[in-house]
Swiss-Prot record:
Cross-referenced PANTHER family: ELONGATION FACTOR TS, ELONGATION FACTOR TS, MITOCHONDRIAL
Name listed for the protein in its UniProt record: Elongation factor Ts
Organism listed in the record: Chlamydia trachomatis serovar L2 (strain ATCC VR-902B / DSM 19102 / 434/Bu)
Phylogenetic classification of the source organism: Bacteria, Pseudomonadati, Chlamydiota, Chlamydiia, Chlamydiales
Gene Ontology molecular function terms on file: translation elongation factor activity
Gene3D superfamilies from the UniProt entry: 1.10.286.20, DNA helicase RuvA subunit, C-terminal domain, Elongation factor Ts, dimerisation domain
Gene Ontology CC terms, in alphabetical order: cytoplasm
Keywords: Cytoplasm, Elongation factor, Protein biosynthesis
Domain of life: Bacteria
HAMAP family: EF_Ts
Family: Belongs to the EF-Ts family.
Compartments in which it is found: Cytoplasm
Function according to Swiss-Prot or TrEMBL: Associates with the EF-Tu.GDP complex and induces the exchange of GDP to GTP. It remains bound to the aminoacyl-tRNA.EF-Tu.GTP complex up to the GTP hydrolysis stage on the ribosome.
Region of interest (Involved in Mg(2+) ion dislocation from EF-Tu), ranges: 80-83
Pfam families: EF_TS
Amino acid sequence: MSDFSMETLKNLRQQTGVGLTKCKEALEHAKGNLEDAVVYLRKLGLASAGKKEHRETKEGVIAARVDERGAALVEVNVETDFVANNSVFRAFVTSLLSDLLDHKLSDVEALARVMSSQEPSLSVEELKAVTMQTVGENIRISRAFYTPVNSGQSVGIYSHGNGKAVAIVFLSGSENQEALAKDIAMHIVASQPQFLSKESVPQEILEREREVFSSQVAGKPQEVVEKITQGKFKAFFQEACLLEQAFIKDPEVTIQGLIDRAAKASGEPLRVEHFVFWKMGA
């Protein structure tokens, strides 16, 4: 039977901001003594972490990795750029990629519950609290992504600004086109397309754009309206759709043209299956 009341447990959680499981552990270790339980949690580096959780986190890093387990992305935010470049913080972020890949997770809450690959005696949430204690700032795991990498795929990753923006590109048709995939990922970070292709633009967005274009040419003859609208849609697709964009390193060719050229040279049926683009705070 526990040597503490639910009221004591509630008070410990309110004082420290630490999770229920660790608070119970602390009270059991302290034989129900609230002050001793707080000391126990402080020694673990957990108690003061809870007090930092209200602080704003505008800096941080987006990290990515691809290996035989799949591809993973994670965005982790802190208060200052100084801590964003701290080696302890970066080691924590790197461990999260391993955790995502090991457990095939894209959910931040689920990630927080698994045992950390960096410190197997602690959950990710507990290790985050210890890291907060070490670096002296609030840490927030904002989002996470995982997807398997299939046979016959080439994956390219490009990171810009020390992890301020990251893109991952998945090419099908070959396992030997990582350089092309990375070039396209670099292009995505620079050009920030919203969609893969014209066909992938949602119908409601097409209708919205058509309404905007039509209002801009109201009162003109119908054939003029159609011609102008077609031209505006072409410009919209060239700006918003990856495959229609001019390649940043060679504006004379579109991304689709770049892929077609590589496919012809290699004899492989290459295509972009999908891409992921994250920008810090977006």
